[in-house]
Amino acid sequence: MKQALLCMSHSPLLHHLDPPADVKASVEAAFDQARAFVHNFDPDVIVNFGPDHYNGFFYDLMPPFCIGYKAKGSGDYDSFAGELNVPEAMAEDLAQFVMDQGLDIAISRQMEVDHGAVQPMEIIYGDVASKPLIPVFVNSVARPFVKVARVRKFGEAVGAYFKNSDKKVLFIGSGGLSHDPPVPQIATADEAQRKMLTDGRNPTPQARAARQQRVIDTAVKFAADEADIMDLNPEWDRGFLDVCASGRIEDFDRYTADDMDAVAGHSSHEVRNWVAAYSALRACGEYEIAYEFYRPIKEYISGFAVTTAILRDI
């Protein structure tokens, strides 16, 4: 088995707000399953599809996709803040291959990734830099969005590059399912918010702390059914997980940005990272789900899922 997959939700609230004990225990059990799966597979290289929450990518230049040749963590919510262990030559070769498939992407020699990208690695390995990892940014919060079909094709191109590799490759997709946290939208942002969305790099510790506290406060209210944000949508979440499990990746194409906003929240677009990861695995062959966990968790403001998948023996 040369390719495998781990897709999982992330939440900056994991270490800031606890759900009920039974829910927290079920999440920890899911993380244990994910750790065992990944450590048993023991990848040589990891391709990490992840979003950003205006910590590394901003409206001054917002690509739909970006492959990092070098990268560091932003350290938001006390997440990893060091240099990632990026195999630079492989990342360069991957980017050129994807472009040769007719997909226009960006590259970065100085990528900054936030909690949304690094949290799976923190959970699985502790040290994000412990394994060679190619960071792949997929725009998941900033309109305008490319069609989901384009995300699928991008993922397939990445997978095609690794299909015949002599390396064991793990595709990670990081993103919450239905959720609508208090992330400003450019269409309704005030002047200060527009400035942050356009170029909010290097915030002061006080500004970052205030921004993060707003999210934590919203989560507390949301768990008490007092927050003015969209509720989670378990039905939508389970429907999306069914598509992931089916292997019919063309079915991802039916998802549209407007519908996702309306029924699953403005940050449900983070499932684009799942689409890319599952499409990458499917490009390597038919797959089957090895493990699936799902709970709607208000304390994390997220439809929260963990899945692993392996290629079928044919």
From Swiss-Prot:
Catalytic activity: 3-(2,3-dihydroxyphenyl)propanoate + O2 = (2Z,4E)-2-hydroxy-6-oxonona-2,4-dienedioate + H(+); (2E)-3-(2,3-dihydroxyphenyl)prop-2-enoate + O2 = (2Z,4E,7E)-2-hydroxy-6-oxonona-2,4,7-trienedioate + H(+)
Origin: domain of life: Bacteria
EC number: 1.13.11.16
BP GO annotations: 3-phenylpropionate catabolic process
Keywords, sorted A to Z: Aromatic hydrocarbons catabolism, Dioxygenase, Iron, Oxidoreductase
SUPFAM superfamilies xrefs: LigB-like
Named cofactor requirement(s): Fe(2+)
Job of this protein: Catalyzes the non-heme iron(II)-dependent oxidative cleavage of 2,3-dihydroxyphenylpropionic acid and 2,3-dihydroxicinnamic acid into 2-hydroxy-6-ketononadienedioate and 2-hydroxy-6-ketononatrienedioate, respectively.
Name of protein: 2,3-dihydroxyphenylpropionate/2,3-dihydroxicinnamic acid 1,2-dioxygenase
Originating gene: mhpB
